[in-house]
């Protein structure tokens, strides 16, 4: 696996030279766990303001939190209801997480239902930091200490993005889903690289836990937001195969075997099917069918939640949603 030497990395390095020279010398002397504790503390400082005082920002947040509160009050952790109606919006996972948080921190305050988002985002920044470190150190001509500095810096920058600052203050699925998808992608990347290094999972069973963890995270993603996690995996898988074939000019699919497909499907089945079965039985199939027909299929057909716009809308919105990281785009 060859390394890449991209000019952009040198440019970014020159722009951050004051930071990396001063702060980097200090950081390098700290133990690794302390570095991540400092980053976590900074992330918390950036994210917590407003989590209690800001009222529900949209209709979905109020309905998610109310449904989770009802689940806790009714002690019914199978059927999702909003007032007297079945709520066929998203699988059960987010309601379990919010109900647990409300049980611990109190069910009356909207803050209790937002806390899982904050925790998920802290984990996300640490996982993303590990991702950046691995990529910078492995694929680019970056020294070990510089890779650590880049990874810590990206975690801090990630936590001050305007779009994320708004999103984590909403009791919805997106922050938790993003955390799970990031972990999923990091593990996928590691498995892929192990395959390229001719790592034989059948001879190194002590590392097979990583593959099982991948499927476990993917299954949790299904419980949080349905098909998004498997769709991300499928698109990533196809993209990597095509890149290997047409960019790397090789057709080596030995890494595909490392995913232990039979075990993976079993893990997904064991984690997701019990709730599907119980919910189907409790509602005579109404909850599951409404979720598939009324939510998932309608979104595909007509953009049920009106998340659409003219071509280029989301590119223009990046200047707002990804501020201030968008300042690095010219480089």
Predicted regions and their residues:
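Membrane-integral, polyisoprenol-dependent glycosyltransferases
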Residues: 2-331
């Amino acid at each position: 696996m060859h390394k890449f030497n991209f000019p952009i990395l040198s440019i970014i390095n020159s722009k951050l030279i004051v930071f990396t020279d001063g702060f980097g010398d200090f950081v390098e002397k700290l133990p690794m766990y302390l570095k991540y504790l400092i980053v976590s503390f900074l992330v918390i400082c950036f994210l917590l303001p407003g989590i209690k005082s800001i009222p529900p920002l949209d209709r979905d947040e109020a309905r998610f939190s109310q449904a989770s509160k009802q689940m806790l009050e009714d002690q019914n952790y199978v059927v999702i209801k909003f007032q007297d109606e079945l709520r066929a919006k998203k699988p059960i996972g987010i309601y379990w997480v919010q109900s647990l948080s409300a049980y611990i921190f109190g069910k009356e305050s909207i803050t209790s239902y937002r806390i899982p988002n904050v925790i998920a985002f802290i984990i996300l920044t640490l996982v993303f930091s590990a991702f950046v470190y691995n990529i910078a150190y492995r694929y680019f001509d970056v020294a070990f200490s510089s890779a650590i500095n880049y990874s810590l810096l990206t975690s801090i920058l990630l936590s001050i993005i305007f779009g994320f600052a708004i999103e984590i203050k909403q009791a919805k699925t997106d922050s938790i889903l993003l955390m799970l998808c990031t972990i999923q992608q990091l593990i996928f990347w590691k498995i892929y690289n192990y395959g390229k290094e001719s790592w034989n999972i059948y001879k190194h069973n002590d590392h097979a836990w990583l593959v099982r963890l991948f499927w476990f995270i993917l299954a949790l993603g299904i419980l949080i937001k349905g098909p998004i996690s498997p769709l991300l995996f499928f698109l990533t898988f196809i993209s990597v195969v095509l890149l290997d074939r047409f960019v790397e000019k090789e057709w080596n699919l030995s890494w595909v075997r490392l995913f232990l497909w039979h075990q993976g499907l079993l893990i997904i089945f064991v984690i997701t099917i019990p709730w599907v079965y119980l919910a189907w039985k409790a509602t005579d199939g109404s909850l599951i069918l409404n979720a598939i027909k009324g939510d998932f299929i309608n979104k595909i057909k007509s953009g049920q939640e009106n998340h659409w716009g003219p071509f280029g809308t989301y590119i223009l919105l990046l200047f707002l949603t990804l501020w201030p990281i968008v300042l690095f785009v010219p480089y």
